């Protein structure tokens, strides 16, 4: 994983995420990284004083994460059905992980589950990378609260793949 340079994205994103937390003065004491891979983002958050946790479907990835950061809690699980008992201030799912969920109902299940283990006022930050291969469709807005709004843009390409892009402000 790291030998191929795939650690670049979580390292770059981790720095940007910490800057966003500082700039927005967001209170983040606990975090969960879905599809955490080798745990790079968890490590970055842990070193920033956040009680970080991670999960991944790959036993091999979690073994590496545990070896590199034994002080961080990691689970081997499927993010479609994952429902930890603990709640978190921040849940992340980056590195194109949601693009691997091919059924829109399963994407919905992930969002429902995240909502269940996200503390009130918490943040779910994720990415979906594939904007060049999908046609444009009308986005829709959701108001989560008076201060937090999100725009979702759901598209389907010619192969039937579902894509979801979001902007939160």
Q: Model-found features: residue ranges?
A:
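Receiver (REC) domain switch-region micro-motif
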Residues: 31, 91
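A short His-aromatic
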Residues: 99-101
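A short glycine-rich, Lys/Arg-flanked "PGG" loop and its adjoining helix->strand segment in the class I
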Residues: 108-120
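Residues lining the SAM
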Residues: 94-96
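Conserved class I S-adenosyl-L-methionine
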Residues: 1-27
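SAM-dependent methyltransferase
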Residues: 125-169
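Class I SAM-dependent methyltransferase SAM/SAH-binding core
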Residues: 32, 39-81
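A short acidic, Gly/Pro-enriched loop at the edge of an enzyme's catalytic core
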Residues: 83-90
């Amino acid at each position: 994983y790291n030998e191929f340079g795939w650690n670049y994205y979580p390292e770059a994103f981790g720095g940007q995420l910490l800057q966003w937390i500082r700039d927005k003065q967001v209170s983040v004491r606990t975090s969960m990284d879905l599809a955490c891979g080798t745990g790079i983002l968890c490590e970055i958050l842990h070193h920033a004083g956040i009680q970080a946790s991670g999960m991944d479907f790959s036993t091999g990835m979690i073994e590496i994460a545990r070896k590199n950061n034994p002080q961080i809690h990691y689970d081997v699980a499927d993010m479609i059905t994952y429902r930890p008992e603990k709640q978190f201030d921040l849940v992340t799912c980056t590195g194109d992980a949601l693009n691997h969920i091919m059924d829109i109902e399963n994407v919905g299940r992930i969002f429902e589950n995240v909502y269940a283990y996200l503390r009130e006022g918490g943040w779910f930050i994720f990415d979906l990378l594939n904007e060049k291969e999908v046609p444009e469709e009308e986005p829709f807005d959701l108001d989560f609260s008076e201060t937090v709004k999100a725009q979702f843009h759901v598209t389907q390409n010619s192969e039937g793949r579902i894509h979801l892009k979001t902007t939160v402000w």
